[in-house]
């Protein structure tokens, strides 16, 4: 890994406008802007390892809005806020005036008087999560423009119906660390494959995030799933266009074995079919509990037809030299451990368990880098100042 000074030099050489926009989809950011987030994250991680404080805010709130359950991302966001010197406040919509009809515009302004960051997870409703984030962003823009807010908080997508940028960027940071550089990722084959799970309704945003980001860096990306387990068509088109622009490739197959063959990286992860998620969204909005039960039963039966989509030792033998890097956003459905039959065998997961933990360890720094890059036009100069002051972190 590069030194902090080398990372700062790289950051200063990049052309970025991240301080002027929210980080909601990776494919809305330029290659330089993606690299800036990676480099700032790496610098923050290195500074913390040297026990140097990275508290760039003396006060301020970081608001969290979780409309779905979370462990890793929730704690990663809290860690990122603390890393930068912000205090966390969770917005419980059930205990707020939102439950009584308060508008998004009003809520966004009322919670932001002293806020420097807002992180939102909203992945339950297909076609709604990312749109909600943009509505919040527009309300914040208006509040700042009208003089209601003294500053415009950074808005971070902590997972929506379309993308999971903090996850995919953490995955990319781990790949850069593992393989040595972004340049070394060119030509590497990554297999983003569906895998069997005894549960249904898992979001599309993780596989969509992977194909939408890894195609930006000249990788050979293979998306594999049984027939009918499609992703959002628009995101698949994004991946195709990205691959053409980066000199990589993108293809879709309906065989896990074909995807794993000669792969350098494998990412076996369950998700619900796009059409099912559309139905589920309609039923959730209609509060149709019986319809949801029927859909779940139907989907679990459909999943059960594909139990052979299982990351086993034999499947891993098909990869390059039998030693592909296994990745997962966690928690994985581990056969015989967290479930009877799932995405991956205990043996394969145990072999790569520490690797997946290191993968996850990048997320707090990625989130912190997104916030810092939105709030400061020259993050390189700020990091240089932190290094110069070298104030020891209070343990």
Q: How would you describe each model-predicted region?
A:
Residues 1-75, 79:
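Positively charged, low-complexity intrinsically disordered leader regions
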Residues 55-176, 334:
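Phosphate/diphosphate ligand-binding glycine-rich loop within oxidoreductases
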Residues 56-62, 186-189, 323:
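Phosphate-coordination loops involved in phosphoryl transfer and adenosine-cofactor binding
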Residues 67-79, 176-290:
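Glycine-rich phosphate/diphosphate-binding loop of Rossmann-like nucleotide-binding domains
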Residues 146-153, 219, 318-327:
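A short helix->loop->beta-strand "cap" motif at the edges of active sites that frequently abuts
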Residues 241-345:
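Rossmann-like adenosine-cofactor binding region
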Residues 319-395:
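Adenosine-phosphate binding glycine-rich loop
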